[in-house]
Amino acid sequence: LMFALARQLPEADASTQAGKWEKNRFMGVELTAKTLGLIGAGNIGSIVAARAIGLKMKVVAYDPFLSPERALELGVDKVELDELLARADFITLHTPLTDQTRGILGREALAQAKRGVRIVNCARGGLIDEAALKEALDSGHVAGAALDVFSEEPAKDNDLFGTPGLICTPHLGASTTEAQVNVAIQIAEQMSDFLLLGGIANAVNVPSLTAEETREELVSLRGPELTGQQQAKPYIGPRPAIVTPFTVRLR
């Protein structure tokens, strides 16, 4: 999406297929030597940083959890959000949607951004104030935006639609044949690890645990039961079942 945004590819494609030849209309910009601002430098953000550095872009990152050592390893400058906004020619978002990140690019932040900035959001809808983004696009302060996610999905009716300089896609982030195959394999491996070994990975309601950690956790949960058995008088008859709720949902 960043390439498409930089070179106005969707507009150029539509124009050419309409029988026009507007070569001079679609003047793009190069990525080389531009500054990319990452909001979020976790797994995906770090991969984007590596790709951008390969394009000879300068990369700055805002992420409260990014250590100076990790920033040095990634080859990025760790900065505060206001500095990122002032320096970035392109901004990409790579953060979950939380109370702290909702509307992180709002009206005030967009006003602080460098004039002519281009914004890409393939992370989560709600990170950008869409009404404020439309105003910034209409005024020309933001030169372009490419969105794969929206505050409400499916986004069948959005005030942003039709705004010049805007590229929209229907949340295609993981929509490749290879990604779907890899997800299926990963889920099968995770279920196998849990059922055969006890390891838990990528659950949404419990921390990831190794097989050994899972065994230790279960021993801890059963501790009161075992203690009660040792102190109780002998009892002849059916043993009451003790059930520990333990539901694992996989991403």
Show the residue positions of the predicted features:
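Phosphate-binding beta-alpha-beta segment of Rossmann-like dinucleotide-binding domains, i.e.
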Residues: 1-35, 47-50, 199-202
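Glycine-rich Rossmann-fold phosphate-binding loop(s) that bind the pyrophosphate
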Residues: 41-42
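Rossmann-like adenosine-cofactor binding region
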Residues: 64-159, 175
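Active-site glycine-centered loops adjacent to acidic/histidine catalytic or metal-binding residues
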Residues: 148, 171, 197
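Short FAD-binding loop at a beta-strand-to-alpha-helix junction that anchors the flavin cofactor
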Residues: 159-174
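NAD(P)-dependent dehydrogenase/reductase Rossmann-like domain
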Residues: 174-251
